[in-house]
């Protein structure tokens, strides 16, 4: 990698230097092995303290890897998570673009300084990240060159900032393994998308799964993982889905049961208490509750989560 391949560019946006110990410094970065003394940021510093998912993968990505990066980043972004990645070619770029398309914030951690754009062809992408309420970040001074060792070092920041890291595609050998190791060291979850056993581009991800990474085999397993790690994420209305198509819409906001389920997932004990207060006179509260939950489930507006609680449906993309 040649430092001359980096573009000395000017990204437009507010510049900040976030010192360790300041209120803007993300607490999660203190979990990494060597927290940086300061972060150089162009864009919105507040995004660094948002709930986020880190998405990483191969630079020389296959169509499968690019598609997985887009799909799962879109699903996560639609549920209120910022998307964190490394701004590299391939899977990283797809993850950033998916977040931007969803109207969500995204963070790009660069290996070099924020005024030494690498790769140069991603200058427009980095500007879009900033314009969309995200941030371009480095632990290096503004004009520090993008030398190889700095990229491996920045992987610990990508892995530590989020509660989970998703590996969408990785071969062997792969720098993605250092990101996975850093995530585990920081107490973050590691998720991985399996690929064909005959694909060299998936050998790394498959190896991570064999070593204990959580396999993401479809939308449902991904959404279950998000719920397990982040709790109840917000319900979204996708294009083509009318805002009034659900019993959890505003037309029923006055219903105490619906309002309670919108606020947080609830177990049967709390639901039974609500039923005692809300069931019409003369009706058995337990029977009334079971009928209401069954109706809401049938209409696709409430679901039972893996831990047995009920809450709003987390909708997959269609």
Q: Over which residues does each language-model region extend?
A:
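N-terminal phosphate-binding or glycine-rich loops at protein starts, especially the Walker A/P-loop
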Residues: 1
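Glycine-biased, small-residue-rich flexible motifs in mid-sequence functional cores and linkers
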Residues: 5-318
């Amino acid at each position: 990698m040649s430092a001359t391949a980096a573009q000395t560019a000017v990204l437009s946006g507010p510049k900040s230097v976030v010192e360790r110990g300041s209120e803007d410094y993300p607490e999660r970065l203190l979990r990494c092995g060597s927290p940086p003394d300061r972060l150089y940021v162009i864009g919105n510093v507040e995004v660094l303290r948002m709930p986020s998912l880190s998405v990483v993968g191969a630079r020389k990505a296959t169509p499968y890897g690019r598609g997985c990066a887009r799909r799962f980043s879109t699903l996560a972004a639609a549920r209120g998570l910022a998307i964190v990645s490394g701004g590299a070619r391939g899977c990283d770029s797809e993850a950033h673009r998916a977040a931007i398309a969803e109207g969500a914030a995204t963070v790009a951690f660069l290996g070099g300084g924020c005024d030494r754009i690498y790769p140069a062809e991603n200058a427009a992408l980095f500007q879009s990240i900033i314009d969309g309420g995200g941030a371009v970040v480095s632990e290096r001074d503004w004009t520090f060159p993008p030398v190889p060792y700095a990229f491996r070092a920045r992987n610990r920041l990508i892995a530590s900032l989020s509660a989970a890291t998703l590996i969408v595609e990785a071969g062997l050998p792969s720098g993605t393994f250092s990101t996975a190791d850093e995530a585990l060291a920081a107490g973050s979850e590691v998720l991985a998308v399996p690929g064909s056993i005959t694909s060299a581009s998936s050998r790394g991800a498959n190896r991570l799964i064999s070593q204990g990474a959580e396999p993401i085999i479809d939308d449902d397993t991904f959404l279950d993982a998000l719920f397990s790690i982040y709790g109840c994420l917000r319900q979204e209305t996708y294009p083509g889905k009318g805002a009034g198509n659900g019993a959890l819409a505003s037309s029923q906001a006055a219903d105490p049961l619906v309002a309670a389920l919108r606020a947080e997932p609830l177990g049967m004990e709390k639901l039974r208490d609500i039923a005692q207060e809300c069931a019409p006179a003369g009706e058995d509260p337990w029977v009334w509750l079971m009928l209401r939950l069954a109706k809401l489930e049938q209409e696709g507006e409430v679901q039972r989560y893996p831990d047995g609680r009920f809450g709003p449906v987390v909708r997959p993309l269609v």
